[in-house]
Regions:
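Zinc-dependent deaminase
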Residues: 2-39, 103, 112-178
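Generic structural signal for well-ordered alpha-helical scaffold segments
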Residues: 33, 37, 80, 84-85
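Short, flexible loop/turn motifs enriched in small residues
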Residues: 42-46
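Short beta-strand scaffold segments in enzyme catalytic cores
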Residues: 47-53
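Short beta->alpha transition motifs characteristic of CBS
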Residues: 59-66
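Helix-adjacent hinge/juxtasegments
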Residues: 81-114, 118
Length: 178
């Protein structure tokens, strides 16, 4: 593990808990923000995700592709598909998914069904909903739920306040241009 750890306060099921995110994890989360920026630059919603093996190597990364017309082309869903096709059940369970935003219910379900391990996210569904409301964006067709309401036994860490404002800015930019 890297030496420096950053404490992030999260709200989960009505109580506050602290999570620790180390330097390596911050680098993966920054890569997620870079991928989200790439999506934005391509005219897509700004989300990015990285799948990392237990040993620390990046296995797969992607950003949103919903502008293609297929609303299921979320990076977290693509990670689940890739992992199901390319990893053993044991390797999936030991892997970590880093992502710019908390999984939506569809992606959380895919994560659970495939048997992926821990999730670390920069911004929560609750934060995103508040940001979009502030921007006057209509509610999506699927209600946002915390990951643990969809996959109760998965290890989840986030949000990471030190990076969340960068994600908020990407959403502000996307929705001000649409």
């Amino acid at each position: 593990m890297d030496g420096t750890r950053i404490s992030a306060s999260i709200l989960a099921t009505g109580f506050e808990e602290h999570v620790m995110v180390n330097d390596g994890e911050i680098q993966h989360l920054r890569r997620c923000i870079e991928l989200a920026t790439e999506a934005l630059e391509l005219g897509d919603e700004p989300f990015g995700s990285v799948l990392v093996a237990a040993e620390g190597q990046v296995l797969f990364e992607d950003h949103n592709h919903v502008a293609s017309g297929d609303r299921t082309r979320h990076p977290e869903f693509e990670i689940a598909r890739w992992a199901a096709a390319n990893m053993t059940p044991e390797a999936r369970a030991e892997a970590t998914v880093y992502t710019s935003g908390e999984h939506c219910p569809m992606c959380a379900a895919a994560h659970g069904w495939v048997g992926l391990g821990r999730i670390v996210y920069v911004s929560s569904s609750e934060q995103l909903a508040a940001w979009l409301t502030d921007l006057g964006v209509p509610a999506p067709p699927v209600r946002a739920l915390p990951i643990r309401e969809v996959v109760p036994n998965v290890a989840v860490e986030g949000p990471v306040p030190a990076l969340a404002e960068q994600v908020r800015d990407l959403h502000r930019r996307f929705h001000s241009s649409t």
